[in-house]
C-alpha cells in the first residue's frame, strides 16, 4: 500500500477560540502555533497547510512572567538612518496587544513559505468580542500551570 499524502483540499478546517486571560504568553503562543500548523491532526504533513483557524480574545489580559514587562524591549526600524524605535513590552501591550501576540505566535512558527498562509488564519482581538460567531468556534482550553 502506498503512503497517503494529504492535499490542501482534503483538509477540513475547524475554528477555535482561545481566551488569553491570565495565560502565559509563551504557552499561549506554542498552543496557537500548533493549532495553526495542524500538528494534532492525523493527516499532518509539514509541507501542506493543514491548520485550523484560531481566534484569540482578551489579548490585553495575557500574563507576562517575572519583570519582562519592564525589562524586555521591542524594536522596529523605519528604514531611514536613525530610525530605530524601541519600546518596552509593557508599553507595547498597552498600545497594541494584538500585535504582541501576533509577533510571538509568528515567532513560534517555522520560517518558511507556509507560515504566511498559516498566519492568515490567526485572528487576535483585545476585547472579549469577535465577529466570527457564525463559524461556531470551539473553545480551546489551555491548562494553567502553577507559577
Swiss-Prot record:
This protein's name: Large ribosomal subunit protein uL13
Name of the gene this protein is made from: rplM
InterPro entries with a match to the protein in the record: Ribosomal_uL13, Ribosomal_uL13_bac-type, Ribosomal_uL13_sf
Known function: This protein is one of the early assembly proteins of the 50S ribosomal subunit, although it is not seen to bind rRNA by itself. It is important during the early stages of 50S assembly.
CDD domains: Ribosomal_L13
Binding partners and assembly: Part of the 50S ribosomal subunit.
One GO CC annotation: cytosolic large ribosomal subunit
One function term, GO molecular function aspect: structural constituent of ribosome
GO annotation, biological process: negative regulation of translation; translation
Phylogenetic placement of the source organism: Bacteria, Bacillati, Actinomycetota, Actinomycetes, Mycobacteriales
HAMAP family cross-referenced by the UniProt entry: Ribosomal_uL13 (MF_01366)
Family: Belongs to the universal ribosomal protein uL13 family.
NCBIfam families registered for this protein in UniProt: rplM_bact (TIGR01066)
